[in-house]
């Protein structure tokens, strides 16, 4: 990801080194223009002398170069981060993103008599909400010595090296770290058991295993894109679908070397060029056994909340200190489809149990049905055991997930759906939970919750 001066010129739309000086000069103060002449191929020393004439001119030049020009450059070359295309953009105000998903509603049977009684009954939409907090507040420090600035104007070649060194030291460092943070989102999501896991043989071991991986990847993509949607491939068990053009595959360089892109593109029913845009090659996953990841393009929730350069001069040390601040939201959407292809014998039979609704509000003396979605990797049915914590006498839950709240219940309840994938001697429970807030039943004068 190291930046060359050709990258700098391309991003600024210039062909010569001195064009950068002139770009700064065009928007500079009259004082700057008085001392710094229009630059050309022959007057590098004259330009340098004008910039170095006093601290005011020097400060204006460095501020424009490092802050304004530098940001233009880094925004252009940031696409070198192969994951940058998934960023959502800027969020200049606030530190929290609220993500809302409205799930489909349940079918109801027509009943003419019931219609007379329930015509004005409310049906609250099945709305689910997630919050993403700003979780990166970093800065990058770079010092520019007066002597370094003088040396930069010995020749235009020196000037090119000077600019490239600044960009690499400040902005490129931030870009590399952003790439590592975005990769970490993938590994953290996997370690929390939030991916739908598809178990595969190691595709690097044989041609047969590689072919089987392609088949499973194709089948998964097709299921994610079915018109009616599915609850099977996201961490909130909402019914959603992905457009095939929005399905992206992440693989490491070793697997990429073994894959026939044309075969894989055909498997996804895409032309080669389009498919290559949907395959992102990274240097590797940190999680053991994780071979590939397939996600909807909206899975990444990465926003820039602040990109700002601050500067201060140390007159005693004869240098300038620059501080480039980068604040971001680095997260992933649990509403979006996301699948991990994993190898090894340590893949658990069940990776996640999701209880829906995850949050419920139930009146005293009333009932609420819950559903458990079991994320299994062995294609088997697994028994779900329901329980409720925090309830008073009379509050219970049935074996099929129907919660009955006691008429005098005032506590907040926790509904649990448990799948045990262990043995009698060594149980390994996988638990999904829902929170239930109990409301008073005003029609019966129930106690206030």
UniProtKB/Swiss-Prot annotation:
Name assigned to this protein: Major capsid protein
One GO CC term, this protein: T=3 icosahedral viral capsid
Tagged with keyword Transcription: no
Name of a matching Pfam family: Big_2
Main location: virion
Lineage: Viruses, Duplodnaviria, Heunggongvirae, Uroviricota, Caudoviricetes
SUBUNIT field: Homohexamer. Homopentamer. The prolate capsid is composed of pentamers and hexamers of the capsid protein.
Xref: InterPro entries: Big_2
């Amino acid at each position: 990801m190291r930046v060359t001066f050709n990258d700098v010129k391309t991003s600024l739309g210039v062909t010569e080194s001195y064009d950068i000086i002139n770009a700064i000069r065009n928007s500079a103060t009259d004082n700057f223009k008085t001392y710094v002449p229009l630059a050309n191929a022959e007057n590098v020393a004259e330009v340098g002398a004008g910039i170095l004439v006093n601290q005011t001119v020097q400060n204006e030049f460095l501020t424009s170069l490092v802050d304004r020009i530098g940001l233009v450059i880094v925004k252009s070359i940031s696409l070198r981060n192969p994951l940058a295309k998934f960023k959502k953009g800027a969020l200049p105000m606030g530190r929290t993103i609220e993500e809302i998903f409205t799930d489909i509603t349940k079918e109801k049977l027509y009943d003419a008599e019931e219609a007379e009684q329930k015509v004005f009954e409310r049906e609250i939409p099945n709305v689910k909400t997630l919050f993403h907090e700003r979780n990166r507040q970093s800065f990058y420090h770079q010092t520019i010595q007066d002597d370094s600035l003088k040396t930069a104007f010995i020749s235009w070649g020196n000037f090119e090296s000077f600019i490239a060194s600044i960009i690499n030291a400040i902005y490129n460092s931030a870009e590399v770290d952003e790439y590592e943070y975005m990769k970490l989102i993938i590994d953290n999501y996997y370690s929390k058991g939030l991916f739908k896991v598809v178990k595969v043989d190691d595709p690097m071991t044989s041609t047969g295993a590689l072919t089987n991986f392609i088949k499973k990847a194709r089948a998964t993509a097709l299921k994610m894109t079915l018109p009616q949607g599915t609850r099977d491939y996201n961490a909130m068990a909402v019914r959603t679908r992905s457009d095939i053009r929005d399905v992206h595959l992440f693989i490491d360089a070793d697997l990429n070397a073994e894959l026939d892109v044309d075969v894989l593109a055909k498997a996804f029913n895409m032309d080669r060029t389009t498919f290559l845009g949907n395959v992102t090659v990274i240097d590797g996953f940190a999680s053991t056994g994780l071979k590939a990841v397939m996600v909807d393009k909206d899975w990444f929730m990465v926003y820039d909340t602040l990109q700002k350069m601050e500067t201060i001069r140390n007159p005693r040390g004869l240098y300038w200190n620059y501080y480039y601040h980068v604040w971001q939201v680095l997260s992933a959407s649990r509403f979006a489809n996301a699948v991990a292809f994993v190898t090894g014998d340590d893949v658990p039979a069940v990776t996640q149990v999701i209880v829906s609704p995850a949050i419920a509000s139930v009146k005293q003396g009333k009932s609420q049905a819950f559903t458990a979605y079991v994320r299994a990797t062995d294609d088997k049915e697994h028994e779900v055991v329901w329980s409720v914590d925090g309830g008073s006498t009379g509050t219970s839950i049935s074996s099929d997930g129907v919660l009955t709240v006691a008429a005098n219940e005032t506590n907040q309840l926790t509904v649990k759906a448990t799948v045990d994938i262990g043995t009698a001697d060594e149980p390994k429970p996988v638990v999904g939970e829902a929170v239930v807030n109990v409301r008073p039943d005003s029609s019966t004068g129930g106690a206030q919750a």
